């Protein structure tokens, strides 16, 4: 008797990407559709929630059909329907949740609600097998966290940002530099052309915990630029980008390496939109390579196309919940403030 393949149709609509995917056995992408809204939000310098919701409504039915067609699947081939239910923009989340619930009720296919952050981390599962326990640095527009995983469904935060997330900081300083939203890719490219000449602060780098603070860096950057404007001094944009990125990468990599030394995970994962940053990817790979062999974890850096918001990562995470029998019912609702649990040590 052959083992039955498990196919999951996944929805993602937590922010400004509408995405659907069909994932087989939690590892194989049979289809992935992403309808981006970046051009609609660029003129505003960031995501406008109402605009995002309207775009989700316009495309979600069509991209659901496209995901099934690309996977050569019908509803009869789908074993579960997965959807991001938080965190994110409440209006945007509701579009995906409503679509997934409607499909589940109409077809009788089980429903699985997925935490968006769990999805970002599980994008690694689409590239390679994760050995547990695992540790992840999750860096995106809304979150900057170090997450410990004892298995595929039990996650706890051991380090968190106390103010700005890394991606948020990139976008805010991007506005100062005149870079279109989203600014991360351009600043990363500029950083590789400049030098760390401004020596911006590395907040909390030597603190005993694994928390982060990026608001001071953001303020120092903005003040430097404003002061230069006042005295009519022209600053090199490449050096500004390099100095900003050096500060972010130094702090993130330093605390991540310390966490690896303490928790000794078998696998290290970099997840989230900022995981596409080449400066961060390169530094972490270099620092982990220097670790002693007995504590050096396997490293999984997700493919660049899976760093941003997408439904494939939601399908991967949902597969683990499916295998554990963790299903949702018709009462599933959007939870814009949904959080992974914090480690007990952080609550003392």
Curated annotation (Swiss-Prot):
Its cofactor is Fe(2+). Binds 1 Fe(2+) ion per subunit. Its EC number is 2.3.1.234. GO terms for cellular component: cytoplasm. Substrate binds at residues 138-142, 171, 184, 188, 277. Belongs to the KAE1 / TsaD family. Required for the formation of a threonylcarbamoyl group on adenosine at position 37 (t(6)A37) in tRNAs that read codons beginning with adenine. Is involved in the transfer of the threonylcarbamoyl moiety of threonylcarbamoyl-AMP (TC-AMP) to the N6 group of A37, together with TsaE and TsaB. TsaD likely plays a direct catalytic role in this reaction. This is tRNA N6-adenosine threonylcarbamoyltransferase. It comes from Lactobacillus gasseri (strain ATCC 33323 / DSM 20243 / BCRC 14619 / CIP 102991 / JCM 1131 / KCTC 3163 / NCIMB 11718 / NCTC 13722 / AM63). The lineage of its organism: Bacteria, Bacillati, Bacillota, Bacilli, Lactobacillales. The gene is tsaD.
